[in-house]
Design a protein with these regions (language model features):
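Compact soluble domain cores
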Residues: 2-60
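Short, compact, well-ordered microdomains
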Residues: 58-97
């Protein structure tokens, strides 16, 4: 079974394997800006002990046009009603970026 970091990287890099939800603040941007922001999320590799203490690659932030952008991956059960009991198990976990 893949580990949490691998599953998170797959979602983040391909935007496949979970849901991608954009905040209102991102959704109101021009399509080219949204595409650039998503590209920065996909290519993010500045993981440190400070922003990734568990080595799961589930959070990051970067500057875009003078604005701080944050992204996060959360783990839900298959109904999206509760947190997943085991984020390492894709059979019982849905990821949301």
């Amino acid at each position: 079974m893949p580990d949490i970091k691998t599953l998170n990287n797959n979602l983040r890099k391909t935007l496949i394997g979970g849901r991608v939800v954009l905040t209102q603040g991102i959704n109101v941007k021009m399509p080219k800006d949204i595409a650039r922001i998503l590209a920065k999320v996909r290519n993010f590799n500045n993981f440190t002990k400070a922003n990734d203490p568990y080595g799961e690659h589930d959070f990051g932030s970067f500057d875009y046009n003078g604005e701080k952008i944050y992204w996060k991956i959360d783990y839900y059960d298959k109904s999206y009603q509760h947190l997943s009991e085991n984020p390492a198990n894709p059979n019982i976990t849905n990821r949301v970026l």
